């Protein structure tokens, strides 16, 4: 049985808000077709292969949005999921998948790397690049889908790319903390407001970025040092978003760097310091709209914009609707 309810989604506009699928109640062909269709609708275009084509495929799937994320729980028999270069040309699939295994084990391959993910550990997959997900036996996992910009706003893109198809162990450290948090989110039955979900999801992605960094995903000590410097500047910006008078020179001084060094850090990520500052302010404004009852003018001021009209124009160009309409639309989705 499959149940679907449509919703807006920043990563894939046709993704169902709620998914429930149990192939046990379907015949072999229908069950496999529904499974493959759900994969494509939720994540990206893929091919699915089964080790025993004539055997019934037993699987269960439940998932829902959680703030900017989508969290699913999966129990399934052995199968293999392949995303090819040709599929990427027809379906960009601009998100990331966090595959957290809770029972059994799976193998993931991407960018010339392969790793086995054991219970309690997780691996990251980039939907914009070819990958293989292989489960040799029945398994259970939690899958968290994050829009690309949500993760890369917290961690340099090159570090994220180097971090795919690597097992982040969950027995100790940040990896274990993040893994337990994602399991708790997936298992949560109590209702939560849209605003609260946005806040918790944002914190969860912060923790995920920390776990990826602590997993020694940097290619060299120099890369790690640059990542730490960039993170320090980003934290200074985030702590001063409310200050409309802060200058880029002020930000550099607070981070203990020259303005030239700060510009080089952001240029290496394909952006500019000012562009990142504006994006951070817009993201803060979006959170205020979803988590508070502040007026649009107050939201504009809290996010560091001098002029509410200028803020509204930037917000509309970034998120596709005015601040007031965005709040109303997402309040309906949350309810």
Swiss-Prot record:
Induction: Constitutively expressed. InterPro entries: AraC-bd_2 (IPR035418), AraC_XylS_family_regulators (IPR050204), Homeodomain-like_sf (IPR009057), HTH_AraC (IPR018060), HTH_AraC-typ_CS (IPR018062), Tscrpt_reg_AraC-type_HTH (IPR020449). Residues 249-270, 296-319 bind DNA. The keyword Transcription regulation applies. PROSITE patterns: HTH_ARAC_FAMILY_1, HTH_ARAC_FAMILY_2. SMART domains: HTH_ARAC. Keywords: DNA-binding, Transcription, Transcription regulation. Gene3D superfamilies: Homeodomain-like. Residues 231-329 form the HTH araC/xylS-type domain. GO terms for biological process: 4-nitrophenol catabolic process; regulation of DNA-templated transcription. Pfam families: AraC_binding_2, HTH_18. One of its GO terms (molecular function) is DNA-binding transcription factor activity. Transcriptional activator of nphA1 and nphA2 involved in the degradation of 4-nitrophenol (4-NP). This is Transcriptional activator NphR.
